[in-house]
Amino acid sequence: MVEIKSCCKSFGSHCVLQDVSLPIPDGKIVGIFGASGIGKSTLAKILCGVLRPDSGEVCLDGKLLVSGKTSYDRRRGLAIQMVYQQPYASLDPSQKLGAGLRELIFYHRLAADRKEADRLVQEILSQMQLSAEILTHLPRQLSGGEAQRAALARCLLLKPELLILDEATSMLDVSTQANLLALVKAQMLPRGGSVLLISHDRALTDFYCDSVYEFDEEHRLKEVRR
């Protein structure tokens, strides 16, 4: 379980997060919605270690992951992965998809040799409903839906405990959006993983999430549906 406790974050005199607390239980989808610039992505970046809170803390399975006084525990932080609104930001523009996936596998020691790495690549492609031919493609050669599933594949290879979707479906059509979220549920929830779905769309979070929170104008987070 991931838990955010009383986190605050400001940039200069501009408060972005004000005493934000949020439990993300195992095996659940938690939704956050709110206007652009209200603090949703800032919270996601704190969870991933891109930003540090000014105060408060984030815990993973009851153990401190980051606080206003401690650096991000990057070894344990691998348990939290994020898919961005722009999938191409997660993909090396000069590297073919297959090479990128194998590099990720060897970097994190997920396989002992090329044969095992190739098996893992084929397995994740099948799970993401991607054809093997895209392994020879550069990111710019992928459609928006393919690029988003490729970015998702990179995250799921690491078998995260928490997957954050930061407006990750906002640029997709309704059918592709539904397909992507179905893939996420199938890969994360059965093994006890959790999902944080961040969106400006209240209807999306209401439909897919077990609990829903809203950022108000004071940059506080309040539960609106359980």
Language model features by range: what are they?
Residues 115-133:
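Conserved ABC ATPase "signature" region
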Residues 159:
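Conserved catalytic motifs of ABC-family nucleotide-binding domains
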Residues 138-142, 146:
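Conserved ABC ATPase signature
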Residues 65-81, 95, 99, 107:
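ABC ATPase NBD coupling module
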